[in-house]
Every structure is written in C-alpha cells, then in structure tokens.
A protein has these predicted regions:
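Phosphate-binding P-loop
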Residues: 26-32
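Pre-Walker A (Motif I) flank of P-loop NTPase domains
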Residues: 32-35, 106
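Glycine-rich phosphate-binding P-loop
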Residues: 38-51
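Post-Walker A helix-loop "phosphate-sensing" segment adjacent to the P-loop in P-loop NTPases
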Residues: 55-62
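ATP-dependent small-molecule kinase phosphotransfer cores
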Residues: 63-123, 138-142, 146, 153-162, ...
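Short glycine-/polar-rich loops that comprise or flank the Walker A/P-loop
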Residues: 122-126, 191-194
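Small-molecule kinase domains that catalyze NTP-dependent phosphoryl transfer to phosphate-bearing small molecules
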Residues: 154-197
C-alpha cells in the first residue's frame, strides 16, 4: 500500500487536492530490480512518490538532482532558476556519477529528472515517470506552480518564474548535451519509462 497525494482540476481550473491510498500489488519483482528511478517535471509529485516508495520498500532514497544542483548553485552563487548558467562540465560530471550509481547500487530509489533517461539499457532498473496532466494529456502547469509555491512557501509569482524559467533552461541545456539540439526532445517522454503515474 502506498499513500499518494493527487491533484486535478475541476471545470474552473482550480486545483483539487486529495490523498489516495493505492494498493500497488506487486508492480515489479524486487528480486530482479536493483534500483527504481523516479523522474518528473518540477513539482509533479516525484519527490513525494520517491520518499513513499523508499519508506515502503525499506530502500535508500537519493534525491540526486537536488543534491547535485544545490551544491553547484551555492558554489557558483546562482539562484534556483539559473540552470542555464551551470557549466556543461558540471552536468557531464553528474552524469558520470549517476551512471556509476545506476550500474552498481542496489535497493535504491533514485530521484532525478534525468534518471529514467540515463537508465536506458541498464539491467535491473525500473523507471517511473510522475506526471501532472489532465485527462487529455496536457501538462497542468498552474497546479505545479501552486504546489511549488505551497511546498517552498514562495509567492505564486516566484514559483511561476522558477517553474517556467528553470524548465526552459534545463531543457535547452539537456537538448544541447543529449539530443543534438532536437527541439522536440524531453526527458519526460513516456517511452523512456516502465510506469507512468
């Protein structure tokens, strides 16, 4: 059993939040899975899911992107949305560390935006994508902005700026590094994942 906080919009586009208990049954065999990756767009609920999975399975949880980004951000004196100012070498170094974790660790819930993408072809990895979409598959950006504002106790304006700028900056950087500048590439492409929640 796992408890997940869900949100959706009603007809007026206001967020309706609820907690839902979901019986996961046996979504994967833990004897063949060494690592579960959890990825999602900013404030989609990926951290909540990763923490709950780690607690439920008794596995270690690493929030890799935040640990990495916070250290780099502080060292370079950048604000949270200035991911475009992070040197490419920092991303490449992080990818090497992430690859080593994906190849060697066990009983780990690894949460980073690129974890599912980077885990392609690695044995023993179960890749989860957390989305915040309406019934038509459209991203619910305003809900994610509201979630970020509530979670970090920021103004809605600051949260909106962070979500929109940081996502754009991340995608621009990663498209350059990993997708030959393909303007359609995203790390949240559902084909990279074993399960989409």
């Amino acid at each position: 059993w796992i408890c997940i906080k869900t949100c959706r919009t009603d007809g007026s586009n206001r967020a309706k939040h609820s907690r839902q208990i979901i019986h996961m049954g046996n979504p994967f065999q833990t004897d063949t899975i060494r690592i579960v990756t959890v990825s999602g767009r900013i404030a989609s609920g990926s951290t909540t899911l990763a923490k709950e999975l780690a607690r439920e399975l008794g596995w270690k949880h690493i929030e890799g992107g935040e640990i990495f980004w916070e250290a780099v951000r502080k060292r370079l004196a950048l604000n949270p949305k200035e991911t475009n100012l992070r040197p490419d070498e920092e991303d490449i170094l992080f990818d090497k560390q992430l690859t080593a974790i994906l190849q060697n660790e066990r009983e780990l819930i690894l949460e980073t935006k690129l974890a599912g993408f980077n885990a392609q072809g690695v044995e023993g990895i179960f890749k989860i994508l957390v989305i915040c979409e309406d019934e038509h598959g459209n991203d619910q950006t305003q809900i994610r902005i509201d979630r970020l504002a509530n979670r970090d106790h920021n103004s809605v304006h600051d949260a909106k700026e962070e979500v929109l700028e940081r996502e754009k900056n991340d995608l621009d950087k990663w498209r350059k590094l990993y997708a030959h500048e393909d303007p359609n590439w995203t790390y949240y492409d559902k084909t990279y994942y074993d399960l989409v929640i």
